[in-house]
Amino acid sequence: MPGYTHLQVAMPSSCGLWLGAYAEALTDDMRLLIAAFEQSNLNPLGSAAGYGSSAPLNRTMTTQLLGFADLDYNAIYAQMNRGRMERTVAFAYSSVAETIGRLAMDCCMFNSQNFGFIKLPDTMTTGSSIMPHKKNPDVFELIRAHANHICALPDTIRHITTNLPVGYFRDLQLLKEVYFPLFDDLNDLLDITTYAVEHMEMKTDIMSNPLYMPAFSVEEVNARVSQGVPFRDAYRQVADEITHGTFQQHASIEETL
């Protein structure tokens, strides 16, 4: 399949290279999730209303019994962390959603007639209300929309808490309706994305289409440079051949990748 920059045919790519990029992005997202977990895995018990308690509490023991990695040492900060903790977790989750949303956009685009790189089963498409030739990629469109919704949550949380002074305020109650659905929403998003990717069909031999021949222009430039032609001259020669319709592909897709 062709690779794109600026939505223009750039260089040869492959299904493995394309999907592998998203796999690697998700591994980076996992690092953010781990960091968010570590920042959240602190014991706030004993902070009471935000200024500690005179009760003889063993905070180290409760930290160990409840499985926290450590404790919040400052009672005021334990309360100030409300909203901050939720925003940190939501940001990590939104990073996963952003990756999934970009993949969904690719799939919507690559499924369209103008690209035609992937084919979706009928169970993942719907017909048009009046155009019988259309099969719309509804599943990936909804994945994209739900991913964008999750991406907006960190800002929603920030706007609830951003100008609060020190201490607890009832404003924080609004976090619950924003934050709690996040976990099920992302899990559902990952489940349906997994199903969709597993059931889509990647078309083969895409690069044999003459439309994508210019994608091999870089290899042709490199070949001429290796024969002693200055890069600038080789670049201009190949560009002129493409402009005048005389460019011929010599490199194979295997050699290029």
What are these regions (language model features)?
Residues 1-6, 73:
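Short, flexible active-site-proximal loops enriched in glycine and acidic residues
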Residues 4-6, 22, 51, 117, ...:
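Aromatic side chains
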Residues 8, 39, 64, 79, ...:
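Residue-identity detector for glutamine
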Residues 11-160:
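Internal glycine-rich alpha/beta core junctions
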Residues 125-257:
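Catalytic-core signal marking the mid-to-C-terminal active-site face
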